[in-house]
């Protein structure tokens, strides 16, 4: 969970179901002290990385150094995914395609980020690593992110 300003408080509990997974709340130095107290009161582990916003690069370094984590899996929304790929912090992109079409102007995208603007914001290239056909005609696509 990435929340640099301490806004998300409803219905959140620490992940205790699976000892193989570890959920960490990520926040920034400007998060209100009462928010950090809220996280502690619910035994929700957190890391502070960044001043006004969560510094994703610093966060990944801290997770590796403090928790010895080598692999992070995120099923985040488009904003976090977009920020990670635009910051060159993703190694792989895994996409699960389901055989349904959901349309609409408000439908979320896989990657929400600033519009392309040459030369500062360029498209991210992907190289196909693997495909698998799953049950119910679903397809799993696994890509390596190629940074030039």
Where are these regions (language model features)?
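Enzymes that bind and transform nitrogen-containing heteroaromatic metabolites
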Residues: 1-148
């Amino acid at each position: 969970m990435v929340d640099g300003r301490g806004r998300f408080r409803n219905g959140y509990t620490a992940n205790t179901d699976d000892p193989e997974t570890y959920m960490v709340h990520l926040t920034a130095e400007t998060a209100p002290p009462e928010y950090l107290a809220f996280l502690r009161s619910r035994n929700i582990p957190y890391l502070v990385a960044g001043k006004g916003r969560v510094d994703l690069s610093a966060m990944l370094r801290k997770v590796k150094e403090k928790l010895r984590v080598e692999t992070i899996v995120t099923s985040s929304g488009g904003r976090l995914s977009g920020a990670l790929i635009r910051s060159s912090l993703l190694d792989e992109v895994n996409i699960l395609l389901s055989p349904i079409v959901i349309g609409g102007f408000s439908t979320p995208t896989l990657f929400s980020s600033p519009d392309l603007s040459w030369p500062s914001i360029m498209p991210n290239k992907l190289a196909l690593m693997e495909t698998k056909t799953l049950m119910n005609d679903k397809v799993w696509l696994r890509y390596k992110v190629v940074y030039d």
